[in-house]
Every structure is written in structure tokens, then in C-alpha cells.
């Protein structure tokens, strides 16, 4: 029995050894198959890599024509007129929708052999019809022209370091003092935007902040101001078409390129609308709620007194002021200055003489002593605060029952250190001894009347000081020229911008 057990144990041991050998061989065979599969896959990938051409990042970039690129106009597809997913062709400058196989940009690439496009929203560059993205430093200048950006150091240098730049045609221009396209009748619009673009805190705010989540009016104004101050521009002028389109929509077509308007009316509407778009609310003297109110808003005290008439039978009518005087403090963004009426009688020698008046004389309206009588009320005005910037509107047009009469009186003024203290309340001056009451002229909007074929046309141009060189430039639409400071006082000043001296 013991011999049989030993034989059975030996037999089991041999069977287990045979099984272990079979399992090892099986694992080796499986591992070998896996290695062969991996080798085959790698060989196939190498073959595919060798047969597939490598697409260069610089392919088609030499077809880009920067002289035809104009990103100032509204980003709308030239075929479907939609403003969604718009791409700009960098060969011809036209706008097309999408980049998929059924898009207008795709068909344009096939039919016109134009291959390089940029997404107008993301500023990413693509090659069509292959539809792959291109990342090249050679395209950064195009992205910068589409959406200029500024650093704090660059903004600080704008008013202290003289700059002279050149466009693609090697035409020199001074950033900030470039022409603005008059599409039809929008010169009233151009001069107002130019003036606002030279208000330092206002300008710096729109150069440095991010407005991606703001209303379109704010975004388009920021882009336009940045393009005005762009020192890497492709051309030495800009077009306000995108901003005007938004203004036309918000104003219900009251302000557009089709009809010329009063610049001061547009300025008032634009500042108030912009204040609301920036989230501003009704401000107090101590706390402005937007950059608009911070830069321009002041407060004026108005004392109103009713005028009563007394008369007895057979006696002359006598007008006396009511004993009750109502006092209100109201905010303002600009001050209206009334010109003295033109002389009624003129002899043959005085007929061609244009009257003159000093700026401080027409500002006496706000000295708190001068009275103004209108519509049965006697009023006195006195400035309660002095904002960083004063905007003066010199009222030149008076409407009567028959026509609008223009007052050609020339206003004379100093260019620097104009003292506003006689018109500001003493309490403000005493409580703010460090705030200067002297102001320097920054911009002067001129009105010009031209008669053609018995019809009168009104033109507006602006004269702006360059603080880095103290030179003056006159801008009328696309025409920019350097002028002498003596020329500033010779025109019919319509709107003036004064900056508090530091």
C-alpha cells in the first residue's frame, strides 16, 4: 500500500510540473504576440507620419495684404449681413460668416484662393479651407490694430513724451491727433469724441479698463479712443462708424451720419447715456458714481425770484421782485454762456466789424451777483464746486419766429491760467485750499458757416493742445495741421474744454 501511495504522489508531481511548463510557455507566447502587435502599430504610425505632409505655420501668410485691412467698420458679413461669428479675410479685407464647410468664408477661400482669416471676436487666426489655427508672431501687429492695449507706463508717457509714428504708407502722424472720417454729416460727432479723448482721467479710464461685460456703447467708445491713441496704426486716420451705429440705435436715429446736429446737444445726450451705461447713478457733491461725473460734473446754486407787476389807474406799471427767494443746487456737466446781442444800428463803417467780448465777461452770469430775467423770473447763478474739467458752451444760435439767427461775436480768452475763483463760492475755495481755481485751455471747437448756392452750411472743427510739446493741432475730419497759438482766438468758439492746472 505504501508503494502505491508513493507512485501516486510521484505521478501528481510530474503532472503539476507539466502544467507549470505549459502555463509559462503560454504566457511567453501571449507576451510575444503583444510585442509583435505593438511593433506593427508603431511601424504603421511611422509610415503614416512619413506619408502625411507637415503643414507649416507660415503657409499663406505671405498673401496677407495689410494695406487693404480696415477694422474700423462694423463687423458684419458682406454676404449674409449677420454679425455672428464673423471672420475677416486678411487678403482682401472683407468680412464673412463662419469657417465651416458650408460657410461664406469657406466658399470665399475656395473661389478666391484667399486662405488667411481672423475671428473678429477672439482674434484667433485660421487658414481655410483646411480650417487649422495659426499661431505666429508675425500676426501680432494685426491683432494689436484690431484691439489696441496699453500699459500704465505707456499711458503715463502719453502726455510727457513726444511721439511721432508712421503708418504703412510711411506717412507720419502724432498719436491722439489723427483725422476722423466724415462718412456723411457726422462732423458734429467727430469733434465731440476728439474732445473727450483728450480728457486725461476719462481717456486713461477707457485705455486701461476691461469692458468685455459692458454695454456695446462703452465697448465701442473704448475701442475708438484706443485707436485714436494707437502708435502702431496701419493708417493715419480712424473711422467712427461702429460707434455711430450704436449711437444711432440708442438715440432712436436722432443722432446719425445722415443729418448734422448741434454738437452741444449731442454732447449732453452722449455723456448722460454713457453715465447710465457705466452703471452711474445720481451723484452727490461728495461722491461721483462714474468717470463722467468725476471728470465734468459740478454744482451750481440757482436763486429764483418771481417778478410781480403793480399798477394803479393812470399810473405807470411797476415791476417788483417777490420777497420769497427759492434756492436750489443743481448739477451740471457743462455751462452755457450767453453772448451779448449784436448792435441793432450800424453805420457804413461799422457794418463789417465783428464785435468782441472777453470770456470772463460772459462768465459773470455765474458770479452770484449778476441777474437774469426771463419768463417772469429773476435768477442768479453761482458755482458751488469746481470740477477737474469745465466745458463751456458759447451760445451762438437764437431761434425766433422766422429763422435761426447766428451771433458772430468773437470771444477772447487766455490760453493758460484762467482764474475761475470770481465765479466759485468762497466756501468751496476755503474748504479745499489745495485745489487750484486756475484752468488751462485743452480743446476749442470752432463753428464755421459757409454759403453755397444761397444755402448756408455749418462746419465744425476742433483745435487741441498737445501737452507733451505744447503745440496746437487743428483737426477737421481727415485734415490735421499744426497751427499757431495765435490762431486759437480768431474763430467762432462754440465749445471749450478747460483743465484744472496742477
From Swiss-Prot:
Protein name (database record): Probable mRNA-splicing protein ubp10
Annotated residues for binding of Zn(2+): 89, 92, 108, 114
InterPro entries in the cross-refs: Papain-like_cys_pep_sf (IPR038765), Peptidase_C19_UCH (IPR001394), Ub_carboxyl-term_hydrolase (IPR050185), USP39 (IPR033809), USP_dom (IPR028889), Znf_RING/FYVE/PHD (IPR013083), Znf_UBP (IPR001607)
Any single Gene Ontology cellular-component annotation: spliceosomal complex
Similarity comment: Belongs to the peptidase C19 family.
Keywords assigned: Metal-binding, mRNA processing, mRNA splicing, Nucleus, Ribonucleoprotein, Spliceosome, Zinc, Zinc-finger
Superkingdom, natural source: Eukaryota
CDD domains referenced in this protein's UniProt entry, alphabetically: Peptidase_C19M (cd02669)
Zinc fingers (UBP-type), renumbered ranges: 56-153
USP domain boundaries: 178-501
Principal location listed in the UniProt entry: nucleus
Gene Ontology biological-process entries: protein deubiquitination; spliceosomal complex assembly
One function term, GO molecular function aspect: zinc ion binding
Described function: May play a role in mRNA splicing. It is unsure if the protein really exhibits hydrolase activity. Could be a competitor of ubiquitin C-terminal hydrolases (UCHs).
Subcellular location as annotated: Nucleus
